[in-house]
Amino acid sequence: MLRIADKTFDSHLFTGTGKFASSQLMVEAIRASGSQLVTLAMKRVDLRQHNDAILAPLIEAGVTLLPNTSGAKTAEEAIFAAQLALEALGTHWLKLEIHPDARWLLPDPIETLKAAEALVKQGFVVLPYCGADPVLCKRLEEVGCAAVMPLGAPIGSNQGLETKAMLEIIIQQATVPVVVDAGIGVPSHAAQALEMGADAVLVNTAIAVADDPVMMATAFRLAVEAGLLARQAVPGNRSTYASATSPLTGFLEALA
């Protein structure tokens, strides 16, 4: 069970809604993933119409919606987008994204911290997408963010946990949930994140662009479950030397 702010989730896999070939395929993949928290970009939906092609199927699916501010380049733009989302969807939950460079889509740490502090004061449940910077993540936690969402690699790159060393520090020092977001390309990346101690992962591109998104969503669900079980089982310590699983000489002594 994963608790963030006032909500609890059985699934430790969060999903996105971009890049799917159709809304029907999107919903089928989300259902196969078991995800209960789904993020969607405010810039991609018609907030005035709940029968929007993306929004309506998600509402019908009964998942918790996590609007995001993707496309915002400044704290002011992100705050404005958050207020629009609150008015349209009636949720204080928000994935805060501010990335001014469209080529790399890396989060702006200064604007993110500035916006997070303001939004928390306005009553939002803020989940900020941020760089894998332990100092920044601690600052975001201190201003009241409900979780932190450090990147594993650039958005949509499928590179995996390129920031592993920094993620380990973030996980070790965090007192709020850590959700690894961005760059996760295959299910083994997700399993590794959970094994490391991450509370959840958010996956979009890797599922949406697969030849079979529904099958890939299922694979991610199983990988996240496996990673969590492995962590709970407490793996053995890593060793420099070999350690035999059975006596090396006992059978020889028995023959003597």
Curated annotation (Swiss-Prot):
Keywords: Cytoplasm, Schiff base, Thiamine biosynthesis, Transferase. Homotetramer. Forms heterodimers with either ThiH or ThiS. The gene is thiG. Pfam families: ThiG. Its EC number is 2.8.1.10. It catalyses: [ThiS sulfur-carrier protein]-C-terminal-Gly-aminoethanethioate + 2-iminoacetate + 1-deoxy-D-xylulose 5-phosphate = [ThiS sulfur-carrier protein]-C-terminal Gly-Gly + 2-[(2R,5Z)-2-carboxy-4-methylthiazol-5(2H)-ylidene]ethyl phosphate + 2 H2O + H(+). InterPro entries: Aldolase_TIM (IPR013785), Thiazole_synthase_ThiG (IPR033983), ThiG (IPR008867). The active site is at 95 (schiff-base intermediate with dxp). It is found in: Cytoplasm. This is Thiazole synthase. The keyword Cytoplasm applies. Belongs to the ThiG family. Signal peptide: none annotated. GO terms for biological process: thiamine diphosphate biosynthetic process. Catalyzes the rearrangement of 1-deoxy-D-xylulose 5-phosphate (DXP) to produce the thiazole phosphate moiety of thiamine. Sulfur is provided by the thiocarboxylate moiety of the carrier protein ThiS. In vitro, sulfur can be provided by H(2)S. Its main location: cytoplasm. SUPFAM superfamilies: ThiG-like. One of its GO terms (cellular component) is cytoplasm. 1-deoxy-D-xylulose 5-phosphate binds at residues 156, 182-183, 204-205. GO terms for molecular function: thiazole synthase activity. Pathway: Cofactor biosynthesis; thiamine diphosphate biosynthesis.
